[in-house]
Every structure is written in structure tokens, then in C-alpha cells.
């Protein structure tokens, strides 16, 4: 399992006092309020303040004190240690843990690795690109077992839930 998570990317400066504008890589931007420190280029830094602006997060990070300082961090990722990540509810997983998991059906047919997880209003969808593109709705009656430690997910056979075109 990954021990460091990317939670955002610095996309611009904000103001003249070293604040940075962050594009969040998490569904719930309010989780930034709970963060005390982050990693940038592997170096731990304290967060001094968190504000929100439309779909962006504005961070004041210790040691970044001027607009020129902030400019040098553009395009860098904001990361956190897994131990600092918010606790998950039962039967939920971090996307970073799901990506790369091998998916099999209950007949032990290998379907491919999860390339990404797509968030939709009704449910998440596992995206397998190879060997054949497949979109798997993350529903309890389709996804039968998730074993993150073994990077293995078992689903119902596709023929039982996918419409034929």
C-alpha cells in the first residue's frame, strides 16, 4: 500500500504573502481543514491557514512567505502520509489503493488491472483499460470482494450484469 498520498497540486500563487492556490485531488475539499502538515518534494511543512475559493484551496504554508517563494512551487504536488489521512468508513477504500488491483470474476477469469476510479453521482466506476476496456459499476451486487493487501478484486461475471449491445 502507498504510504504517501497526493491530495492536491499547486497551480498558482495567491496574493503577495506566499499563499498558494491548490487544485484538490480529493472529493471532499473540507478535509484540507483537518491537515496540520503536508509534504512538498518530500519535505514536511506546517499549514498555517486554509481558505477556499470556488473549486480551489488556498493554503498558507510555513516557509513560503512571498509571492516569489510561492512561484517556485507551481505545479508541485501536495502530499500527506497515510497516517495523517482521514479515517475511512467501513467498506470504503482510497483510490490510490484500488488502482493497480487485479480484477477477476467469480469464475476466476482475469479481467485486468484497475487503471482509475471514476466518480459518478450514483456510484463509483472501476476503469480497466487493458487487455479490453471495461467499466465496472461499484455496486454491492457486482463487486463481491476487495482484498487490498493482495491487490485483488472479485466481481460477478460480466455477462451477468452487463447489457449486450
Curated annotation (Swiss-Prot):
Chain ranges of the PRC barrel domain: 89-161
Keywords: Chaperone, Cytoplasm, Ribosome biogenesis, rRNA processing
Subcellular location: Cytoplasm
An annotated GO BP: ribosomal small subunit biogenesis
GO cellular component: cytoplasm; ribosome
Gene Ontology molecular function terms on file: ribosome binding
Protein's UniProt keywords contain RNA-binding: no
UniProt-listed Gene3D superfamilies: PRC-barrel domain, RimM
Entries under PANTHER family matching the protein: RIBOSOME MATURATION FACTOR RIMM
Domain comment in the entry: The PRC barrel domain binds ribosomal protein uS19.
Function: An accessory protein needed during the final step in the assembly of 30S ribosomal subunit, possibly for assembly of the head region. Essential for efficient processing of 16S rRNA. May be needed both before and after RbfA during the maturation of 16S rRNA. It has affinity for free ribosomal 30S subunits but not for 70S ribosomes.
Family: Belongs to the RimM family.
Subunit-level organization: Binds ribosomal protein uS19.
Name by which UniProt lists this protein: Ribosome maturation factor RimM
Organism expressing this protein natively: Clostridium botulinum (strain Eklund 17B / Type B)
Organism placement in taxonomy: Bacteria, Bacillati, Bacillota, Clostridia, Eubacteriales
This protein's encoding gene: rimM
Amino acid at each position: 500500500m502507498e504510504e504517501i498520498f497526493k491530495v492536491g497540486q499547486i497551480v498558482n500563487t495567491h496574493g503577495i504573502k506566499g499563499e498558494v492556490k491548490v487544485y484538490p485531488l480529493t472529493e471532499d475539499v473540507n478535509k484540507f481543514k483537518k491537515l496540520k502538515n503536508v509534504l512538498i518534494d518530500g519535505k514536511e511543512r506546517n499549514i498555517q491557514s486554509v481558505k477556499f475559493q470556488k473549486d480551489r484551496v488556498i493554503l498558507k504554508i510555513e516557509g513560503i512567505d512571498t509571492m516569489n517563494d510561492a512561484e517556485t512551487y507551481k505545479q508541485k504536488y501536495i502530499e500527506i502520509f497515510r497516517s495523517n489521512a482521514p479515517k475511512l468508513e467501513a467498506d470504503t477504500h482510497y483510490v490510490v489503493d484500488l488502482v493497480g488491483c487485479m480484477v477477476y470474476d467469480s469464475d476466476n477469469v482475469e479481467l485486468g488491472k484497475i487503471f482509475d476510479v471514476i466518480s459518478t453521482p450514483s456510484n463509483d466506476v472501476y476503469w480497466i483499460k487493458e487487455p479490453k476496456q471495461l467499466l465496472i459499476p461499484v455496486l454491492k451486487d457486482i463487486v463481491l470482494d476487495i482484498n487490498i493487501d493482495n491487490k485483488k478484486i472479485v466481481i460477478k461475471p460480466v455477462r451477468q450484469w452487463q447489457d449486450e449491445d
